[in-house]
Each structure stands twice: as C-alpha cells, then as structure tokens.
C-alpha cells in the first residue's frame, strides 16, 4: 500500500479522500505526521491556497504531499463565494449553516441559480536525486475537478458537509446531501480532481 500525506486535519475531507482512493493508498493526515498547525490560506485563488498548504508541509516535513482547496462558484454572484467559500459569512470560520444562509439570502429572487463546485489539488512530489536520498528535488503538479449544478431554494438532506444541502449537481434532482456519500464520491468535484491525481501516480 502506498503512503501519501494529505495536508488537512479536516476529518470530513480526509474521510472523503480515503473513501475515493480506497485500499490502494494509505492517506495520512497532518496530525498523523505530527503537524497541529492551522496552515494559513491567504491566497487569492484556489490554486494559490492549495500550493500554500502543500508547500508548508513539504518545507517542514520533506515528504511528498498534496493539498486541496475547494470553492463554490455561483454565476449570478460573479463567482462568489469562490475562494472565500469556507468563511463566506462575516465573522465565521467554517460555519456551514451561516454560509448557506447568507448565500440563500443573496440569491433570493434571482432566476439564475447556476453554480459549480471546483476543487484544485496541488501535489508536491519529492524526487531523490541520488540513491541514498541525501539530495532531492521537488516537482509541483496541479489537478482540477469541476461539477456543474445549481443552488436549491432551501436545504435538503442531512449527509455530507459544507454547502452539500443546497447544491444540486447537474443531471440530478437531489442535493449532494440527499444523494449520499457513495453517489457523491463518484461524481463530485473532489473525486474528479483526485482521479486525475491517481492517474498521474499510476504512471510513476
């Protein structure tokens, strides 16, 4: 089994990634490598945030690792909440209920409710230059996953996390929270980004 470090201590995201990757990989969290730091996310884009987190782990622990950042991009709001999705409601940090309430208020009365979830994964690969491992170089790779859909007028379902109760993926009439983990993990933005990461890893 291959071991790979995922730069997160978010148990929801960690379990989702483990479910997607299955038994082929041992996915290790930040806590499991001794990192309890809340790595800052100060980038202006999902790409910058994912790189920032992966770079921190690589610099401090010298291991191959990957990090992700995800944003919900709503067409009628010019792409908001986007990179600020986790902290969309002012004065809150990862408060999903407050974030959803704010988004529903802002879309109240709007006909266009088209939206998409976008995940960017940054994988920093440590490559040993000599057999003893005394010298190494890093390679940076980025993978993107997108799922289109629309925002419901109210919450539906109890599974999942984040904006799942109000996001209805394309070609479905139920929210992510209603579809359940098995279906969501097969079609989600994160699953699509992870699939591209796995495709790359299999070539190694």
Model-derived segments and spans:
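Anionic-ligand binding patches
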Residues: 2-5, 11-204
């Amino acid at each position: 089994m291959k071991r790979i470090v995922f730069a997160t201590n978010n148990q929801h995201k960690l379990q989702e990634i483990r479910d997607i990757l299955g038994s082929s990989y041992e996915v290790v969290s930040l806590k499991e490598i001794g990192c309890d730091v809340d790595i800052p996310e100060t980038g202006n884009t999902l790409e910058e945030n994912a790189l920032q987190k992966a770079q921190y782990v690589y610099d401090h622990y010298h291991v191959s690792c990957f990090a992700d950042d995800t944003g919900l991009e709503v067409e009628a709001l010019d792409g908001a909440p986007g990179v600020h999705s986790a902290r969309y409601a002012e004065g809150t940090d990862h408060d999903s209920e407050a974030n959803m309430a704010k988004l529903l208020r802002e879309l109240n009365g709007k006909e266009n409710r088209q939206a998409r979830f976008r995940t960017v994964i940054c994988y920093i690969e440590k490559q040993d230059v000599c057999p003893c491992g005394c010298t190494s170089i890093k390679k940076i790779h980025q993978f993107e996953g997108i799922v289109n859909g629309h925002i419901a007028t109210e919450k539906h379902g109890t599974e999942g996390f984040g904006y799942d109760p109000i996001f209805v993926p394309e070609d479905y009439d139920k929210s992510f929270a209603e579809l359940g983990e098995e279906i969501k993990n097969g079609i989600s933005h994160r699953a699509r980004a992870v699939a591209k990461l796995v495709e790359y890893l299999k070539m190694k």
